[in-house]
Swiss-Prot record:
Binds 1 Fe(2+) ion per subunit. Its cofactor is Fe(2+). It is an enzyme of class 1 (oxidoreductase). It holds the Pfam family 2OG-FeII_Oxy. This is Probable iron/ascorbate oxidoreductase DDB_G0283291. Fe cation binds at H230, D232, H286. 2-oxoglutarate binds at R297. One of its GO terms (molecular function) is metal ion binding. It comes from Dictyostelium discoideum (Social amoeba). SUPFAM superfamilies: Clavaminate synthase-like. Transmembrane segments: none annotated. It comes from the Eukaryota.
């Protein structure tokens, strides 16, 4: 197993305090100040940390603890919740190396989750991909596997961070001199929420023997990253990462580290916000190093995306840049500003490359 070594620039992503004040005047002033910080961060980095977000640390710690217990279960147990079983809902467990970036295996395992929609929901009845029920252990299984509260904790976390996403999109709208409800009135009143719990097993290298702390692989030589270089697809990603670290962001000056900072989330904009802003706010490439810490790394990205059936278009009347087409320098060489279609069409094309076999079988 090999890992590419590149110089890392010493540079710090902005940390933005989004905590609001009590009365209306103070809150409006704070929103304007925060939005200015977000504008600068989105123009210069496409990434920023937030603190003062209001998500209870006890909830985060509980979910991290339960997630680690889940991933420590025997592989045969985890496979009871494999993604193939969820069919079009595209939910469930995938094995280490089961997810691809640019055709190469990522060194992580994970759970795909999202907003819980019952079988009688109109989008589920219409067999809309990526909508439906999550694959959770039953209460009896939670007791048996010592992960009691796993389902409830996940759904609580999704609900609270989704609400945070709505608040952040208001601030992003204000940062563009738009009405606070610009995105919610057009694209995100009923957002597509894609939530992931990722576990990056630690790698132990000794001579020619390549092993992880938990498993071995027959195809290690093709693995170079925990997650390879990519951009996110939607409008906003809200990421919690544990204290292991490994996230890297491609700034204007080169690759920089985005280390864990207690009490914060890492936020970044995605392809659709890049498209809507005409490239003013760029979706920034990022990646995760192979984990050599000696212990597993956990992260929780929540992708706050436009409604599946919405048609994102460029915002009129905002600041323009000269060269919005950056396809020549993008990791995938795709011009997102030339795309015409629904967000669902864009997303299905992208995720089909992440799980090509699954796409062929269920979509």
């Amino acid at each position: 197993m090999t890992s590419k070594i590149e110089n890392i620039t010493i540079e710090q992503l902005p940390i933005i305090d989004i905590e609001s004040y009590g009365n209306d005047k103070e809150e409006e002033l704070k929103k304007k100040l925060i939005s200015k910080e977000i504008e600068n961060a989105c123009k210069n980095f496409g990434f920023f940390y937030i603190k003062g977000h209001g998500i209870d640390q006890e909830l985060i710690d509980r979910l991290e603890r339960l997630s680690k217990k889940f991933f420590s279960l025997d592989q045969s147990i985890k496979m009871k919740y494999r993604m193939e079983l969820a069919q079009k809902a595209w939910r469930g467990y995938f094995v280490v190396g089961g997810e691809l970036t640019s055709g190469l295996k990522d060194w992580k395992e994970g759970l795909y989750l999202g907003t819980e929609l019952n079988d009688d929901h109109p989008l589920v009845i219409a067999q809309t991909p990526l909508h439906g029920l999550n694959l959770f252990p039953t209460l009896e299984e939670e007791i048996e596997y010592d992960i009691v509260g796993f389902k409830d904790t996940i759904l609580t976390y999704i609900d609270k961070v989704t609400k945070l996403g709505h608040s952040l999109m208001e601030l992003i709208a204000i940062s563009l001199n738009l009405s606070a409800d610009y995105f919610s009135s057009r694209y995100t009143k009923d957002p597509l929420i894609l939530y992931r719990i990722f576990n990056y097993p630690s790698i132990i290298s000794s001579g020619d023997d390549n092993k992880t702390t938990g498993e071995s692989s027959d195809d290690n030589d093709k693995v170079e990253w925990g997650v390879g270089e990519h951009t996110d697809y939607g409008v906003l990603t809200i990421l919690y990462q544990d204290d292991v670290g490994g996230l890297q962001v491609h700034s204007k000056n080169g690759w920089i580290s985005a280390p864990p900072i207690k009490g914060t989330f890492v936020c970044n904009i995605g392809d659709m916000l890049d498209r809507m802003t005409g490239g003013l706010y760029r979706s920034t490439p990022h990646r995760v190093e192979l984990n050599r810490s000696g212990r597993d790394r956990i992260s929780f990205p929540l992708f706050f995306d436009p409604n599946f059936n919405s048609y994102p278009t460029e915002i009129e009347g905002i600041e323009q840049i000269e060269n919005k087409d950056d396809s020549s320098s993008r990791w995938d060489h795709f011009n997102i500003h030339s795309f015409k279609g629904s967000y669902g069409q864009y997303l299905l094309n992208k995720i089909g490359k992440v799980f090509p076999d699954l796409k062929n079988n269920v979509l």
